[in-house]
A protein has these predicted regions:
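Bacterial N-terminal signal peptides that target proteins for export
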Residues: 1-10
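Metal-centered catalytic cores of metalloenzymes
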Residues: 26-130, 134-268
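Bacterial Sec-dependent signal peptides at the C-terminal "C-region" and cleavage site
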Residues: 17-29
Length: 268
Protein backbone atom coordinates (compact mmCIF):
# COMPACT_ATOMS: atom_id res chain seq x y z
CA UNK A 1 0.00 0.00 0.00
CA UNK A 2 0.93 3.66 -0.33
CA UNK A 3 3.99 4.94 1.53
CA UNK A 4 5.39 1.64 2.74
CA UNK A 5 8.87 2.07 4.18
CA UNK A 6 10.98 -0.48 2.31
CA UNK A 7 14.68 -0.91 1.62
CA UNK A 8 14.64 -1.91 -2.05
CA UNK A 9 17.92 -3.79 -1.81
CA UNK A 10 16.77 -6.17 0.89
CA UNK A 11 13.07 -6.72 0.32
CA UNK A 12 12.58 -10.13 -1.21
CA UNK A 13 12.89 -13.36 0.69
CA UNK A 14 12.14 -16.35 -1.52
CA UNK A 15 12.25 -19.74 0.14
CA UNK A 16 13.11 -22.80 -1.93
CA UNK A 17 12.11 -25.55 0.45
CA UNK A 18 12.78 -29.24 0.31
CA UNK A 19 9.82 -31.57 0.14
CA UNK A 20 10.33 -32.59 3.75
CA UNK A 21 9.51 -29.01 4.86
CA UNK A 22 6.40 -28.52 2.77
CA UNK A 23 3.88 -29.44 5.42
CA UNK A 24 0.23 -29.11 4.54
CA UNK A 25 0.56 -29.68 0.78
CA UNK A 26 1.24 -32.92 -1.04
CA UNK A 27 3.12 -32.09 -4.23
CA UNK A 28 5.44 -29.33 -5.47
CA UNK A 29 3.43 -28.28 -8.51
CA UNK A 30 0.14 -29.83 -9.58
CA UNK A 31 -0.82 -30.31 -13.22
CA UNK A 32 -3.51 -28.23 -14.90
CA UNK A 33 -6.91 -29.98 -14.73
CA UNK A 34 -8.32 -31.06 -18.09
CA UNK A 35 -11.65 -29.32 -17.40
CA UNK A 36 -12.51 -28.74 -13.74
CA UNK A 37 -10.47 -28.62 -10.56
CA UNK A 38 -7.56 -26.67 -9.09
CA UNK A 39 -3.93 -26.40 -10.20
CA UNK A 40 -1.29 -25.22 -7.72
CA UNK A 41 2.04 -23.45 -7.95
CA UNK A 42 5.16 -24.39 -6.00
CA UNK A 43 4.76 -24.24 -2.18
CA UNK A 44 6.92 -21.78 -0.23
CA UNK A 45 7.58 -22.05 3.50
CA UNK A 46 6.04 -19.21 5.52
CA UNK A 47 5.87 -19.35 9.32
CA UNK A 48 5.26 -22.96 10.34
CA UNK A 49 3.36 -23.78 7.15
CA UNK A 50 3.37 -23.23 3.41
CA UNK A 51 1.82 -20.86 0.89
CA UNK A 52 1.23 -21.36 -2.84
CA UNK A 53 -0.73 -19.88 -5.72
CA UNK A 54 -3.58 -21.65 -7.44
CA UNK A 55 -5.99 -21.44 -10.37
CA UNK A 56 -9.44 -23.05 -10.19
CA UNK A 57 -11.20 -24.19 -13.37
CA UNK A 58 -14.86 -24.89 -14.14
CA UNK A 59 -16.15 -25.88 -17.54
CA UNK A 60 -12.63 -25.62 -18.91
CA UNK A 61 -12.24 -21.95 -17.95
CA UNK A 62 -10.36 -20.30 -15.11
CA UNK A 63 -12.90 -18.99 -12.60
CA UNK A 64 -10.60 -18.05 -9.72
CA UNK A 65 -6.91 -17.31 -9.14
CA UNK A 66 -5.67 -17.13 -5.60
CA UNK A 67 -3.28 -17.88 -2.78
CA UNK A 68 -3.69 -20.89 -0.47
CA UNK A 69 -2.17 -20.81 3.01
CA UNK A 70 -1.91 -23.99 5.06
CA UNK A 71 -3.35 -23.71 8.56
CA UNK A 72 0.10 -23.69 10.19
CA UNK A 73 1.15 -20.50 8.37
CA UNK A 74 -0.48 -18.44 11.12
CA UNK A 75 1.97 -19.86 13.66
CA UNK A 76 5.61 -18.80 13.66
CA UNK A 77 5.23 -15.80 11.38
CA UNK A 78 8.31 -13.55 11.41
CA UNK A 79 8.23 -10.44 13.58
CA UNK A 80 9.46 -7.02 12.48
CA UNK A 81 12.84 -7.59 14.13
CA UNK A 82 13.24 -10.99 12.45
CA UNK A 83 13.94 -9.43 9.07
CA UNK A 84 17.51 -10.13 7.88
CA UNK A 85 18.35 -6.43 8.03
CA UNK A 86 16.18 -5.79 11.07
CA UNK A 87 14.47 -2.57 10.04
CA UNK A 88 11.84 -3.41 7.43
CA UNK A 89 8.12 -3.41 7.98
CA UNK A 90 7.33 -6.18 5.49
CA UNK A 91 8.43 -9.74 4.70
CA UNK A 92 7.90 -10.70 1.05
CA UNK A 93 7.71 -14.20 -0.40
CA UNK A 94 7.45 -14.68 -4.17
CA UNK A 95 5.03 -17.32 -5.46
CA UNK A 96 5.20 -18.73 -8.97
CA UNK A 97 2.01 -19.54 -10.88
CA UNK A 98 0.70 -23.00 -11.82
CA UNK A 99 1.85 -24.45 -15.13
CA UNK A 100 -0.48 -23.54 -17.99
CA UNK A 101 -1.86 -20.55 -16.08
CA UNK A 102 -4.33 -18.80 -18.47
CA UNK A 103 -4.69 -15.62 -16.41
CA UNK A 104 -2.67 -12.42 -16.97
CA UNK A 105 -1.08 -12.79 -13.52
CA UNK A 106 2.54 -13.93 -13.80
CA UNK A 107 3.58 -14.19 -10.13
CA UNK A 108 2.41 -13.22 -6.64
CA UNK A 109 4.20 -11.10 -4.07
CA UNK A 110 2.91 -12.42 -0.73
CA UNK A 111 3.72 -9.86 1.98
CA UNK A 112 3.39 -10.28 5.74
CA UNK A 113 3.36 -6.97 7.63
CA UNK A 114 3.61 -7.77 11.38
CA UNK A 115 3.16 -4.14 12.42
CA UNK A 116 1.08 -3.04 9.48
CA UNK A 117 2.33 -0.06 7.50
CA UNK A 118 1.56 3.55 6.67
CA UNK A 119 -0.63 5.51 6.75
CA UNK A 120 -0.84 5.34 10.56
CA UNK A 121 -4.29 4.87 11.98
CA UNK A 122 -5.49 3.07 8.85
CA UNK A 123 -3.26 0.18 7.80
CA UNK A 124 -1.26 -0.28 11.00
CA UNK A 125 -2.88 -3.61 11.88
CA UNK A 126 -0.94 -6.88 11.33
CA UNK A 127 -1.99 -7.91 7.85
CA UNK A 128 -1.12 -9.62 4.58
CA UNK A 129 -0.73 -8.03 1.13
CA UNK A 130 -1.44 -10.28 -1.86
CA UNK A 131 0.13 -8.62 -4.93
CA UNK A 132 -0.99 -10.42 -8.11
CA UNK A 133 1.48 -9.05 -10.67
CA UNK A 134 0.89 -8.83 -14.42
CA UNK A 135 4.58 -8.40 -15.20
CA UNK A 136 7.47 -10.87 -14.90
CA UNK A 137 9.32 -10.93 -11.59
CA UNK A 138 12.56 -9.81 -13.25
CA UNK A 139 10.84 -6.68 -14.60
CA UNK A 140 9.46 -5.88 -11.16
CA UNK A 141 12.84 -6.30 -9.48
CA UNK A 142 14.26 -3.78 -11.97
CA UNK A 143 11.83 -1.10 -10.75
CA UNK A 144 14.37 0.76 -8.61
CA UNK A 145 15.29 4.47 -8.59
CA UNK A 146 18.83 4.10 -9.92
CA UNK A 147 17.91 6.99 -12.22
CA UNK A 148 15.59 9.13 -10.10
CA UNK A 149 14.26 11.22 -12.99
CA UNK A 150 13.41 8.14 -15.05
CA UNK A 151 11.86 6.38 -12.05
CA UNK A 152 9.65 9.37 -11.25
CA UNK A 153 8.62 9.79 -14.89
CA UNK A 154 7.48 6.16 -15.03
CA UNK A 155 5.58 6.62 -11.77
CA UNK A 156 3.78 9.69 -13.16
CA UNK A 157 2.86 7.88 -16.38
CA UNK A 158 -0.67 6.69 -15.58
CA UNK A 159 -2.73 4.25 -17.66
CA UNK A 160 -5.31 5.72 -20.05
CA UNK A 161 -8.73 6.11 -18.38
CA UNK A 162 -10.26 3.07 -20.09
CA UNK A 163 -7.59 0.89 -18.45
CA UNK A 164 -8.21 2.27 -14.95
CA UNK A 165 -10.64 0.28 -12.76
CA UNK A 166 -13.92 2.07 -12.05
CA UNK A 167 -13.86 4.18 -8.89
CA UNK A 168 -10.09 4.03 -8.35
CA UNK A 169 -7.74 6.99 -7.94
CA UNK A 170 -4.01 7.40 -7.35
CA UNK A 171 -3.61 9.68 -4.29
CA UNK A 172 -0.14 10.72 -5.48
CA UNK A 173 2.24 9.77 -8.32
CA UNK A 174 4.59 8.10 -5.84
CA UNK A 175 5.86 4.63 -6.70
CA UNK A 176 7.06 2.08 -4.18
CA UNK A 177 10.25 0.53 -5.62
CA UNK A 178 9.66 -3.01 -6.91
CA UNK A 179 5.89 -2.49 -6.55
CA UNK A 180 4.55 0.59 -8.34
CA UNK A 181 1.98 3.36 -7.78
CA UNK A 182 -0.93 2.27 -5.58
CA UNK A 183 -4.51 3.14 -6.56
CA UNK A 184 -7.29 3.18 -3.95
CA UNK A 185 -11.08 3.28 -3.88
CA UNK A 186 -11.98 6.34 -1.75
CA UNK A 187 -15.29 4.68 -0.88
CA UNK A 188 -13.50 1.87 0.96
CA UNK A 189 -14.59 1.55 4.61
CA UNK A 190 -11.17 2.41 6.06
CA UNK A 191 -11.35 5.88 4.44
CA UNK A 192 -14.81 6.47 5.84
CA UNK A 193 -14.43 6.07 9.57
CA UNK A 194 -14.42 2.28 9.82
CA UNK A 195 -11.65 -0.02 10.99
CA UNK A 196 -9.54 -1.73 8.34
CA UNK A 197 -10.18 -5.46 8.03
CA UNK A 198 -9.93 -5.92 4.26
CA UNK A 199 -9.55 -3.77 1.16
CA UNK A 200 -8.59 -3.97 -2.50
CA UNK A 201 -5.93 -1.95 -4.31
CA UNK A 202 -4.60 -1.75 -7.86
CA UNK A 203 -1.13 -0.73 -8.99
CA UNK A 204 0.38 0.93 -12.05
CA UNK A 205 3.80 1.57 -13.54
CA UNK A 206 4.96 3.25 -16.73
CA UNK A 207 1.50 3.67 -18.25
CA UNK A 208 0.12 0.22 -17.43
CA UNK A 209 -1.86 -1.46 -14.71
CA UNK A 210 0.54 -4.05 -13.27
CA UNK A 211 -1.05 -5.56 -10.16
CA UNK A 212 -4.24 -6.31 -8.27
CA UNK A 213 -3.94 -6.48 -4.47
CA UNK A 214 -6.26 -7.72 -1.75
CA UNK A 215 -5.02 -6.50 1.67
CA UNK A 216 -6.46 -8.41 4.64
CA UNK A 217 -5.77 -8.41 8.36
CA UNK A 218 -4.49 -11.54 10.03
CA UNK A 219 -7.48 -11.41 12.38
CA UNK A 220 -9.93 -11.33 9.47
CA UNK A 221 -8.36 -14.36 7.82
CA UNK A 222 -8.25 -16.29 11.09
CA UNK A 223 -11.95 -15.57 11.70
CA UNK A 224 -12.64 -18.15 8.97
CA UNK A 225 -15.48 -16.16 7.47
CA UNK A 226 -16.33 -16.59 3.80
CA UNK A 227 -16.65 -13.15 2.25
CA UNK A 228 -16.89 -12.20 -1.43
CA UNK A 229 -16.60 -8.49 -2.19
CA UNK A 230 -17.25 -6.88 -5.62
CA UNK A 231 -14.45 -4.71 -7.01
CA UNK A 232 -14.25 -2.09 -9.73
CA UNK A 233 -12.81 -3.25 -13.02
CA UNK A 234 -11.51 -1.46 -16.10
CA UNK A 235 -13.30 -1.22 -19.44
CA UNK A 236 -10.25 -2.57 -21.25
CA UNK A 237 -7.15 -4.60 -20.44
CA UNK A 238 -3.71 -4.27 -21.99
CA UNK A 239 -3.18 -8.04 -21.72
CA UNK A 240 -5.86 -10.49 -22.86
CA UNK A 241 -7.03 -12.92 -20.21
CA UNK A 242 -9.38 -13.58 -17.31
CA UNK A 243 -9.83 -10.65 -14.91
CA UNK A 244 -11.58 -10.45 -11.52
CA UNK A 245 -14.88 -8.75 -10.72
CA UNK A 246 -14.64 -9.64 -7.00
CA UNK A 247 -12.30 -11.06 -4.40
CA UNK A 248 -12.98 -13.82 -1.90
CA UNK A 249 -11.68 -14.73 1.56
CA UNK A 250 -12.47 -18.20 2.88
CA UNK A 251 -11.44 -21.12 5.05
CA UNK A 252 -11.43 -24.31 2.96
CA UNK A 253 -12.32 -26.96 5.51
CA UNK A 254 -11.77 -29.92 3.19
CA UNK A 255 -8.27 -28.79 2.20
CA UNK A 256 -7.51 -27.31 5.66
CA UNK A 257 -6.26 -24.08 4.12
CA UNK A 258 -7.04 -20.37 4.08
CA UNK A 259 -7.72 -18.98 0.61
CA UNK A 260 -7.63 -15.42 -0.72
CA UNK A 261 -8.71 -15.24 -4.34
CA UNK A 262 -9.42 -12.97 -7.26
CA UNK A 263 -12.84 -14.31 -8.19
CA UNK A 264 -15.65 -13.84 -10.69
CA UNK A 265 -13.14 -13.95 -13.55
CA UNK A 266 -14.34 -12.64 -16.91
CA UNK A 267 -12.55 -12.55 -20.27
CA UNK A 268 -11.17 -9.26 -21.58
Amino acid sequence: MLLKTINTLGLVAVVAAGAELLTGFSSPKDLVPATDGTAYGTPVVVGSGTVRSYVTYAGGEAVEVGVAMSEAVMQGLPAAGDHPEGHHDTHEFVLDMPDGNPTPFKHVGFNWNPGGHEPPGIYDQPHFDFHFYMIPEADRMAMVPADTADFNAKARSYPSPEFVPAGYVAPAPVAIPQMGVHWIDPKSPEFNGKAFTQTFIYGSWNGKLIFAEPMITKAMIESRQTVTTPIGSAERASLPGRYPTSYTIRWNERAAQYEVALSGLVTK
